[in-house]
C-alpha cells in the first residue's frame, strides 16, 4: 500500500524579495555605465549653480539637544541611543531610490561644531540636492572612534528618475554642491579629519569622500578602492 506523503511547499517569498532587489541595483549601475558619455556631455552644458543659503539655521549645540523637531523642511531626530543626529527632508526633492551612493565629510574632531556652523546654511538650503543627511553627536562617541576622528557628516544621494537613474541636472547640482561644501570649509581654514579607509576621493577633495555602501564595506581594501574609483556615479562627480 503506497504511503501518502505530506505536501510540503517551501515558501520562497522572502528569498524572492532579496533576489529581486539585487538585479535591480546591478541593472541601475549598468544603466548608469551605459549612459555615462551622454550624461557626461549633458552635465557640462549646464552653467554654474548657485545655492540659496538657508538663514536662521540651528547651531550644533541646538541639534544636540533636540529630540525631534522640524526645521527648514527637515525633520531633525536625535535619539539618546544613537550616536548620530539625523535630518530628513519632509518633502523629498528626489523621488527615486537610494542605490548606495553617499558622501562623507571628515573634520578634525574639535572643529566639528564650527564646521556644522559653516555648512548648515547649505545643508538646510531649499536648493540642496541632498534630502537626507546625518552628523555625529560628538558627545556620544569615543575620541578614536571611526565617526569621531572623521566621517562625521554623511550625505545620502537619491536618484530622481525611473529605474533608479540620475538625471544630468541632478548630477550637476550634486557636483556643484560638493564643490561648495569643500570651498566653504577650505575658505574657513577648517582642519580636515581622517577620511575613512572604506572611501575614495580625488586629490583636490580635502574633506569629502565617496562610497557606495551596497558594493563595498567599511574595512576597505585595494580592490575595493579600485572598484569605487570605477563607479560611474563617482566618475561623473570628478571627471
Swiss-Prot record:
Record keywords, A-Z:
Lyase, Plasmid, Secreted, Virulence
Compartments annotated for it: namely: Secreted
What's in the GO CC field? extracellular region
Give the EC number(s) listed in the UniProt record.
Answer: 4.2.3.-
The record's InterPro entries line, in alphabetical order, gives: OspF/SpvC, OspF/SpvC_sf
Q: Does the keyword Transmembrane helix apply?
A: no
| One GO MF term | lyase activity
Instruction: Describe its function.
Output: Catalyzes the removal of the phosphate group from the phosphothreonine in the mitogen-activated protein kinases p38, phosphothreonine in the mitogen-activated protein kinases such as MAPK2/ERK2, MAPK3/ERK1, MAPK8 and MAPK14 in an irreversible reaction, thus preventing the downstream phosphorylation of histone H3. This epigenetic modification results in inhibition of the transcription of a specific subset of pro-inflammatory genes, and ultimately to a reduced immune response against the invading pathogen.
Tell me the protein family, please.
Belongs to the phosphothreonine lyase family.
What NCBIfam families does the entry give? Answer: PRK15245.1
Could you identify this protein by its name?
Phosphothreonine lyase OspF
The organism is Shigella boydii serotype 4 (strain Sb227)
Q: Which gene encodes it?
A: ospF
